[in-house]
């Protein structure tokens, strides 16, 4: 499956906000002009963006935040639309309960890309079973842990230390000494951090 491997800062500048693709705890705001589009001089056109363009940009932004490609994103939206409740909130819950995102939220990876790599390299277990599919859906009560062979990796230790300092989301409980965490429940919309307007995505797919 193809994935973007170019400069991460360029993606954040394209969306005009820090997508935290380089580090979960360190903002890009001090390193580059997020309000300036990528390119030698940035985008200078003052043309107003259409409603469709705004909706499309929001979808692209969310795809980049979670590292999901178009076909997969469409499947998530279709599933979110089938479920009871608010479609936009359902969509974010599906994305947040991906295994790679849960590993990231528990602080085992400093970015979602790093967390995805840990899963792909079989460094993660779910309920004691090795898991290597980043898109695996984690359920309430599932225990996600770092395998013994990976516990001494410096990047994991450092990421976990930074996450402890910054605080964990309320919907996960992490035992840093054991390198494991429990997915307590699906996050409520208010618990999901980030500059995301999911209603724009719902409007886009409702056209």
Curated annotation (Swiss-Prot):
Disordered as annotated region, ranges: 31-55
GO cellular component terms given for this protein: small ribosomal subunit
Residue ranges, compositional bias (Polar residues): 42-53
InterPro entries for the chain: Ribosomal_uS4 (IPR022801), Ribosomal_uS4_bac-type (IPR005709), Ribosomal_uS4_CS (IPR018079), Ribosomal_uS4_N (IPR001912), S4_RNA-bd (IPR002942), S4_RNA-bd_sf (IPR036986)
GO biological process terms, semicolon-separated: ribosomal small subunit biogenesis; translation
Keywords assigned by UniProt, alphabetized: Ribonucleoprotein, Ribosomal protein, RNA-binding, rRNA-binding
Disulfide-linked positions: none
Free-text function comment from the UniProt entry: One of the primary rRNA binding proteins, it binds directly to 16S rRNA where it nucleates assembly of the body of the 30S subunit. With S5 and S12 plays an important role in translational accuracy.
Protein name according to UniProt: Small ribosomal subunit protein uS4
Lineage start: Bacteria, Pseudomonadati, Pseudomonadota, Betaproteobacteria, Burkholderiales
Gene: rpsD
């Amino acid at each position: 499956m193809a994935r973007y491997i170019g400069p991460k800062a360029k993606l954040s500048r394209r969306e005009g906000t820090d997508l935290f693709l380089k580090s979960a705890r360190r903002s890009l705001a001090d390193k580059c002009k997020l309000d300036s589009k990528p390119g030698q001089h940035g985008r200078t056109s003052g043309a107003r963006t259409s409603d469709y363009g705004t909706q499309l940009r929001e979808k692209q932004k969310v795809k980049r935040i979670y590292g999901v490609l178009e076909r997969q994103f469409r499947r998530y939206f279709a599933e979110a639309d089938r479920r009871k409740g608010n479609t936009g909130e359902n969509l974010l819950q599906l994305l947040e309960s991906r295994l790679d995102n849960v590993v990231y939220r528990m602080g085992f990876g400093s970015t979602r890309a790093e967390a995805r790599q840990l899963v792909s390299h079989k460094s993660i277990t779910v309920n004691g079973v090795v898991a290597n599919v980043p898109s695996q859906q984690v359920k309430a009560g599932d225990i996600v842990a770092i395998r013994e062979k990976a516990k001494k990796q410096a990047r994991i230790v450092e990421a976990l230390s930074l996450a402890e300092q910054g605080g964990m989301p309320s919907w996960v409980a992490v035992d840093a000494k054991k390198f494991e965490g429990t997915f307590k429940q699906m996050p409520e919309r208010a618990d999901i951090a980030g500059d995301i307007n999911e209603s724009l995505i719902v409007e886009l797919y409702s056209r």
